[in-house]
């Protein structure tokens, strides 16, 4: 059950305020995807990280290694991939993000776009759980 956290208060579960967890997630997307800094995953993902996203391919390794491999594979397929955050809400130890992804497929030169909702659970200043619901990629003119 979600609890309302007073404005500016540090949540003992996350070690951060709501504004800080929003900024943490914003920076994670910017570094990990837009700047293609896969190494930040070793810092941001907790060792016990679990990815519950519907987009995760079967056989992906668990933990941070799986998340890094998944995004690394996507960046090879779409080297110019970018994510734009459209909206973000923080409550208790979770951040919900509405975003739009774009990228040009390296093999075909075709540009794609998809959107989604990603929910992150944060504990002790790290990402510990992810749920993602994404649209089917569509061709963009």
Residue ranges and their predicted role:
Residues 2-20, 30-33, 37, 52, ...:
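A beta-strand edge to alpha-helix "cap/lid" segment located at domain peripheries
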Residues 27:
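Alpha-helical scaffold segments in soluble metabolic enzymes
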Residues 46-48:
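Conserved class I S-adenosyl-L-methionine
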Residues 61-64:
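Domain-length accessory/inserted modules outside core catalytic folds
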């Amino acid at each position: 059950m979600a609890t309302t956290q007073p404005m500016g208060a540090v949540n003992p579960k996350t070690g951060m305020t709501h504004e800080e967890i929003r900024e943490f997630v914003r920076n994670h997307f910017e570094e990990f995807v837009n700047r293609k800094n896969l190494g930040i995953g070793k810092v941001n993902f907790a060792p016990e990280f679990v990815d519950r996203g519907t987009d995760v391919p079967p056989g992906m390794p668990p933990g941070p290694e799986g998340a890094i491999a998944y995004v690394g594979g996507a960046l090879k397929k779409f080297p110019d991939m970018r994510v734009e955050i459209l909206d973000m809400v923080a409550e208790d130890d979770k951040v919900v993000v509405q975003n739009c992804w774009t990228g040009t497929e390296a093999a075909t030169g075709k540009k794609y776009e998809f959107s989604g909702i990603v929910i992150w659970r944060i504990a002790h200043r790290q990402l510990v759980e992810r749920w993602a619901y994404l649209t089917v990629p569509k061709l963009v003119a």
